[in-house]
Amino acid sequence: CCPISDIVGVCLAIRDWLLFMSSDKSYSTHLSIEELLEQFSKGSSSKRRSLIRTVEERVDEISLLGYDSLSIFDPEGDDWAAGWILQVQQRHKPDELRKSFSVDSKGWFKTHSLVGIDYLPFQKALISESFEEADRFTSSTLRQLAGEAAESRGYVYFSEVKNMPGDDLVTLDRLWRAYSQGRFGFSVQAKLLGSLGGRYDRLWPRIGWKED
């Protein structure tokens, strides 16, 4: 949630709240669960956001579908609707969610690493909405990708990014976007930073990392 001292943030928060409240609950609750998931996956951005609460309310039906609840989504993609479906099942039906995936599963979203990094702990943290843990994993992974010097000093220089494996950066970015309703990720924050004139002091409040 954006701090109220940021006028732009307030406007965005109000917009999201209105979209949230605009959900036609009487209509969406009469959809079959398959129809609901179809609209949640293919509807307009505003329609999808208006169905967020309904999807969570019908998690019992979704969990009964098992792995098929995600059959209309692409595991190579970054669709936050798929991420949300996984998160609400983790919130309310964790045992059923575990049964839907094999014991040796690497997570529903496919991940790629050129240096052998295991992204399963990262996906587990994001599915469980343990975002601080996910952030620590991200920071640690970036240092690892940058090399021994970055690991020793504890942070990454901008100049080191160009030498990082692209597949790993894409994987981190995809998973953040998929499990944050499209609000977080390197590409999302870069776009937002550009809209703020490159000012980090304005970025931190907008993404909820700092309140004025």
PLM feature segments, named:
Residues 49-52, 64, 83-86, 98, ...:
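Conserved positions within tetratricopeptide repeat
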Residues 128-134:
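Short helix-adjacent coil turns
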Residues 27-38, 60-73, 95-109:
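Amphipathic alpha-helical scaffolding segments comprising HEAT/armadillo-like alpha-solenoid repeats
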Residues 89-90, 97-104, 108-116, 120, ...:
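C-terminal-biased regions
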